[in-house]
Design a protein with these regions (language model features):
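Non-ligating segments of multi-cofactor redox enzymes
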Residues: 1-301, 306-307, 313-316, 320-344
Length: 344
């Protein structure tokens, strides 16, 4: 713990976790539904345990006990948390963030100097196997609304700001920002793979130049500064009080842009009962992803939009209980409704 406290990342993560905890409890009191209670405590638990205690206390403590000195413990630690002199605990325990934050949101375990096969396998399984399967059943919100640390802050600290998200066709054009960032990560990935596979060839050298140029490149204009720090951190959080807590998630997150593709094949829907809809527009107003929920409800058709993160605000705010989370079959027929009650 002493070595962890010496790291700036420890204090950043501590403050982040405390904010999620405090504002999460406030959210539970503000929205006393079964769904919000389970969702919020899940977000708090994930932020507190695997995203804070694990890298900054549990793993360093196990290392001090000698659990990673020999045997299978050392084999596992060497594969996931390499020994380093540049990180106070002696191993790169911060890479444990990659157990929760999938590529390309957390890209540092993939974009390494030498290939780390364990993390490459984990990242492939996370991003291209587990996420598509989970989203197929529960929608994009299974990750954005229940697991991701960005979503945790948005649903807790940003909960009272959700009505500030701009709506309308022009806002959808801003989604290209996330698509562009996703394209950059794919270019980075391809360049990194070519440089690994052909290190001594002109193709490998050229790919390596592209990789370093985009990732590190011009100071303050590189991917690591512009996207990872400015857009996701400074701008994303700074705009909470102007355009809601989901600015980064909706417009700029490269992982969300990828999951939008997966979500188009999802069976998750917000089921609407047209007979009960009074066109009050409350459901659309509280959507911090900019979805025209009322437009679907007025027509009595299930809400189908890849932007939905299952926050449940529209379901809870509806005064006539028009909306419910559910699942449809291939023909669009409702086959299942969520067991967790999202209305008061």
């Amino acid at each position: 713990l002493v070595t962890s406290v010496a790291q700036p990342g420890f204090w950043y993560s501590l403050v982040y976790t405390l904010v999620v905890l405090v504002f999460g409890i406030r959210r539970i009191h503000r929205r006393p539904t079964q769904y919000v209670r389970w969702q919020t405590w899940t977000l708090i638990s994930i932020q507190a345990i695997p995203l804070f205690l694990l890298p900054y206390w549990i793993l360093p403590w196990l290392g001090d006990l000698g659990c990673f000195d020999d045997g299978w413990g050392r084999t596992l630690a060497d594969a996931l948390f390499p020994i380093t002199e540049n990180y106070p605990p002696g191993r790169e325990y911060w890479r444990a963030f990659g157990l929760i934050l999938a590529w390309p949101l957390f890209f540092w375990n993939v974009f390494t100097d030498q290939p780390m096969m364990a993390w490459l396998v984990i990242s492939v399984i996370q991003t291209f196997v587990l996420l598509p399967l989970a989203i197929r059943r529960w929608g994009k919100g299974v990750y954005c609304g229940w697991i991701c640390s960005c979503g945790a802050l948005a649903e807790t600290l940003g909960d009272t700001q959700r009505r500030k998200m701009p709506h309308g066709p022009w806002t959808h054009r801003l989604n290209f920002v996330g698509q562009f960032f996703l394209l950059l990560t794919l270019i980075l990935l391809e360049a990194r793979l070519w440089s690994w596979c052909f290190p001594d060839s002109w193709l490998g050298s050229w790919s390596l130049s592209i990789y370093h140029g985009i990732l590190h490149g011009i100071p303050l204009l590189s991917y690591e500064w512009t996207v990872d720090l400015f857009f996701s951190g400074i701008l994303g959080v700074g705009l909470y009080w102007h355009f809601s807590g989901r600015v980064w998630c909706r417009f700029a997150c490269p992982l969300a842009a990828l999951m939008n593709i997966y979500a188009r094949f999802s069976r998750f829907r917000i089921i609407a009962d047209k007979k009960r809809c009074i066109s009050c527009n409350l459901c659309t107003a509280v959507c911090h992803q900019g979805i025209d929920v009322m437009g679907f409800a007025q027509r009595g058709i299930p809400v189908e939009d890849p932007q939905c993160v299952r926050c449940s605000a529209c379901v809870e705010e509806c005064p006539t209980a028009v909306l419910r989370f559910g699942e449809v079959d291939r023909d669009g027929r409702v086959v299942r409704l969520d067991l967790l009650e999202a209305t008061i």
